């Protein structure tokens, strides 16, 4: 039974999310497919996605798990959340989508229903740092007791040392609101963020704080109000050092394996630093990552977690085994500059082999290709027996310069595009709701749209398998004449060009995100 203080705290959190809910989005780094791919890279096989059991703790309206449920009809997906408002609306959306493999439950994680059984993938995103220690331990209890033997979980949380800078911003916003309250101002959730923004804008403009802190403060002002409210004004915001987080995990028979954002576990740093840290930390991967966090001022982590008993089965190392790399699927699209070089992060790629890899990936896009297949194609083209394709593929993955998947993805090309019926109701939700509470997302989580262009939605719904692009062009031209669709033209372009361009964009969007497979 939770103590009295925790119960009061839970009520405050519940009211906060009932009164000011987040828009519910899909987060790529939390998805079961991402968890599976990263662990496959480290030699650990997790359960098949197609019939997996998935749990999300703190699911909001379900926006993070609905796309997975849509794509995997044989999977069973459950979300729990404190906010009854969000759960009720989320279940209404699910019912309208006609989904029978997903349900949302209004439940406190401390009262988790043991009858829900084991899960292959557990997601807890944007929760852990915003609850007290008793609830944190309750979350870890659920993961320990309900994660299947070879399952994996995702936990995201704010981390030190990076968050120490941001605490200055949180403190000044809370200080200003408290000061104004004491002077008789009516401060509540509807205006707290507005006053808070004023405080950090003042700080950003006139403070003698160092540029790193100022940069972080300026970044806050660009965020949505609902994000600032829950990130900086919640009763709880408890960042942790990674080593502290892992200590809590070990107390529950769990371990931090790796960050879902691989760059945080395997950063691109000098050999000198790497050698010093290896000498200092040996095989202690958490200690090494903690040093990385100190060096690089990390403020947020997305830990992939599993049972401590699985540690010996996982190659937790920057040196990925070729046998584990061979079956990883990659895809990417790259453009050359006017001088004929690929440019990545403002750097011209002049290495011949890397350029050849980018050529092959771009030619194959939007289909995926295994690293093994990629290596063979490079060998065929450069006529050299030896190459560094595997090392370069790892570099691209660590640097987030290529999409990586555990399963092959093949785009379906059709003269008459047909949206898969399972996505029809999903698209219709965004057509009929001017203020959707979930974001439109691909099932991989690589795409999130808060708002979709109405013209694009109109085009996508015409992809029913009976119409060519030319047919759709003529239909839209007629709709524009009748005033049913408004086409906005930039100077120098015609409405016909705009329509054709939008049709091409929509076709690419549907195919690249596999909405027609």
What is the predicted role of each segment?
Residues 98-109:
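Conserved SAM-binding strand-loop segment of SAM-dependent methyltransferases
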Residues 83:
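Conserved SAM/SAH-binding beta-strand->alpha-helix loop
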Residues 114-121:
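A short acidic, Gly/Pro-enriched loop at the edge of an enzyme's catalytic core
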Residues 61-74:
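Conserved SAM-binding loop of SAM-dependent methyltransferases across substrates and taxa
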Residues 137-149:
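A short glycine-rich, Lys/Arg-flanked "PGG" loop and its adjoining helix->strand segment in the class I
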Residues 19, 27-52:
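Conserved alpha-helix/loop element of class I SAM-dependent methyltransferases that forms part
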Residues 155-183, 195-205:
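Conserved class I S-adenosyl-L-methionine
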């Amino acid at each position: 039974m939770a103590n009295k203080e925790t119960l009061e705290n839970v009520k405050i959190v519940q009211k906060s999310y009932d009164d000011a809910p987040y828009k519910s989005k899909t987060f790529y780094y939390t998805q079961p497919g991402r968890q599976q791919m990263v662990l496959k890279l480290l030699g650990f096989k997790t359960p098949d996605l197609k019939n997996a059991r998935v749990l999300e703790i703190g699911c909001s309206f379900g926006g993070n798990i609905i796309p997975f449920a849509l794509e995997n009809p044989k999977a069973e997906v459950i979300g729990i959340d404190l906010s009854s408002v969000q759960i009720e609306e989320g279940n209404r959306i699910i019912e309208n989508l006609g989904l029978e493999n997903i349900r949302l439950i209004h439940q406190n994680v401390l009262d988790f229903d043991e009858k829900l059984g084991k899960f292959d993938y557990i997601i807890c995103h944007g929760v852990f740092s915003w609850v007290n220690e008793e609830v944190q331990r309750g979350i870890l209890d659920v993961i320990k007791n309900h994660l299947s033997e070879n399952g994996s979980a995702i936990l995201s949380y704010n981390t030190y040392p990076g968050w120490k800078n941001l605490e200055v911003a949180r403190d000044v916003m809370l200080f200003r609101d408290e000061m104004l309250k004491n002077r008789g101002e009516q401060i509540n959730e509807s205006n707290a963020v507005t006053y808070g923004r004023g405080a950090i804008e003042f700080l950003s403009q006139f403070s003698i704080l160092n540029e790193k802190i100022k940069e972080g403060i300026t970044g806050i002002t660009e965020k949505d109000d609902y994000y600032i409210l829950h990130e900086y004004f919640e009763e709880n915001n408890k960042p942790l050092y990674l080593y502290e987080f892992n200590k809590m995990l070990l107390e529950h028979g769990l371990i931090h394996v790796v960050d879902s954002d691989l760059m945080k576990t395997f950063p691109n740093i000098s050999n000198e630093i790497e050698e010093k840290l290896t000498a200092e930390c040996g095989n202690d991967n958490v200690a090494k990552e903690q040093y990385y966090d100190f060096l690089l001022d990390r403020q947020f982590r997305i830990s992939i977690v599993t049972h401590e008993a699985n540690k010996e089965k996982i190659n937790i190392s920057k040196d990925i085994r070729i046998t584990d790399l061979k079956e990883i699927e990659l895809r990417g699209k790259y453009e050359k500059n006017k001088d004929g070089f690929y440019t990545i992060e403002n750097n011209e790629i002049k290495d011949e082999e890397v350029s050849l890899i980018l050529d092959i990936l771009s030619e194959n896009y939007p289909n995926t290709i295994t690293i093994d297949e990629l290596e063979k194609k490079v060998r065929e083209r450069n006529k050299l027996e030896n190459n560094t394709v595997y090392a370069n593929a790892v570099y691209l993955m660590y640097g987030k310069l290529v999409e990586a998947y555990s399963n092959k993805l093949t785009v379906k090309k059709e003269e008459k595009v047909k949206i898969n019926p399972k996505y029809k109701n999903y698209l219709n939700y965004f057509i009929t709701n001017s203020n959707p509470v979930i974001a439109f997302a691909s099932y991989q989580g690589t795409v999130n749209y808060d708002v979709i262009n109405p013209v694009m939605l109109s085009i996508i719904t015409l992809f029913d398998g009976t119409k060519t692009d030319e047919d759709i062009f003529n239909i839209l031209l007629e709709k524009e004449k009748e005033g049913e669709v408004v086409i906005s033209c930039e100077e120098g372009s015609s409405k016909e060009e705009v329509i054709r361009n939008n049709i091409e964009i929509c076709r690419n969007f549907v195919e690249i995100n596999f909405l027609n497979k």
